[in-house]
Amino acid sequence: MSVKMEKIEKNTVELEVTVDAKVFSAAVTKAAKALANKVNIPGFRKGKAPRTMVERYVGTAALYNDAVDDILGVEYMKAVNEAGIEPVDRPDVDLIQMEDGKELVFKAKVTVKPEVELGSYKGLEVEKTAAVVTDEELEQELQRKQEQHAKVLNLEEGTVQAQDTVNIDFAGSVDGVAFEGGTAEGYDLVIGSGSFIPGFEEQLIGAQIGQEVDVNVRFPDEYHVADLQGKDALFKVKVNKLKRKEYAPLDDEFAKDISEFETLDELKADLRDKLMTAAEQRAEMEQKNAIVAKAVENASVEIPEAMVNSRIDMMLDDMAQNLSYQGLDLETYCHYTGTSMDTMREELRPRASENLKTELVLEAIAKVEGITVSEEELNNELAKLAERYQTSPENLKQALMARGDMGMYRQSLVSEKTVNFLVEQA
């Protein structure tokens, strides 16, 4: 095999690949045997017709095309490795010569990973945000603890209050006509959660268990279902059940009940320490992000459209998987939100480009600085990850390799080391 490479435009090269005549001839012979097993050739049992008869029966072009299909992928990857390029899209292939007994020659136009022109990335000055815990934040954390340990009371009687969980049946209509998604039975709604359209929840306050209530609302002008935007609606609502949370007072007894501490002051001190640790971690992460952002801003790189589109595809795949957990798909999501796949792709484009630039710049810095991840470091990180997922490092390693994600995982560790390097150099 021989490979000639020509740069035809930015981020695009053309490979002219010459495959040995013996390799192509062997591929033709193999293709002939495969075709002999598939087609019925008069006078011969399946698989017994000689190559000349197969070629005469199916045609030279069909035979040679099968041979090329069989070896093109392998020969292309050999050429890519020999040329030392990193394709980011499928090649555009043209066959130049395809004759038995002669070399197979093809050209492949390939979009490759772009070169990064690094700017300043050492000694970057970024102010670190001071980690602070306010009394208000501590109070909010105490309230969260109070919420977590609240008792839920199933009321036999009483009226709906704010923060109650009310179980309701409802049927909505616009101009007397029911609409899709406007009817449900046994629905649990937290009053004040804002999960229904404005005005709905407030009109249930004061209703009694078993009571039927007419709720009049107007759909917002920007409502996700276009047909309902700005429309007046009537909901017939029946209150089935009522739940209310009972909160323990914030005192020493509360501290004893939910923690190892004897007093509320001790609990507060512990919570403040934990909040401070979290605040320091956030400040550190913000500083890291700011340093990386500056290094990326100082660099220049022209990202091929194919790379951006591929990344958008990945982002949409992730989104589709997350939606599937809610019993939805992208098409349904687009319908509910009044958008389209094209609009979503364009909205994701800036983030996809920004993420790619960050990855490429970090990769370029790692290459210049010789930052790598050793097998020992890789195995140590795999062990930590395996412990988190309650599996063995070997099982995790096999799973990553089976999905073809090991290279991506290793690169993420290299990127992490590179970020730490930038912080150390700042």
UniProtKB/Swiss-Prot annotation:
Q: Give me any GO biological process, just one.
A: protein unfolding
* Molecular function per GO: peptidyl-prolyl cis-trans isomerase activity; protein folding chaperone; ribosome binding
* Every PPIase FKBP-type domain range: 163-248
Write down the chemical reaction(s) this protein catalyses: [protein]-peptidylproline (omega=180) = [protein]-peptidylproline (omega=0)
Q: Which residues form the signal peptide?
A: none
User: Which superkingdom does the taxonomy of this entry point to?
Assistant: Bacteria
> What broad class describes the main subcellular location of this protein?
cytoplasm
Does the keyword Cytoplasm feature in the UniProt annotation?
yes
* Coiled-coil segments: none
Cell compartment(s), UniProt: Cytoplasm
Alphabetically ordered keywords of this record: Cell cycle, Cell division, Chaperone, Cytoplasm, Isomerase, Rotamase
Q: What class of enzyme is it?
A: isomerase
* Gene Ontology CC: one annotated term: cytoplasm
Q: Which Pfam family would be a valid example here? A: FKBP_C
Q: What are its E.C. numbers? A: 5.2.1.8
**InterPro entries for this protein:** PPIase_dom_sf (IPR046357), PPIase_FKBP_dom (IPR001179), Trig_fac (IPR005215), Trigger_fac_C (IPR008880), Trigger_fac_C_sf (IPR037041), Trigger_fac_ribosome-bd_bac (IPR008881), Trigger_fac_ribosome-bd_sf (IPR036611), Trigger_fact/SurA_dom_sf (IPR027304)
Under the heading SUPFAM superfamilies, the entry gives: FKBP-like, Triger factor/SurA peptide-binding domain-like, Trigger factor ribosome-binding domain
Q: What does this protein do?
A: Involved in protein export. Acts as a chaperone by maintaining the newly synthesized protein in an open conformation. Functions as a peptidyl-prolyl cis-trans isomerase.
- Per the record, what about its domains? Consists of 3 domains; the N-terminus binds the ribosome, the middle domain has PPIase activity, while the C-terminus has intrinsic chaperone activity on its own.
Homology family: Belongs to the FKBP-type PPIase family. Tig subfamily.
- HAMAP family from the xrefs? Trigger_factor_Tig (MF_00303)
Protein's name in the database: Trigger factor 1
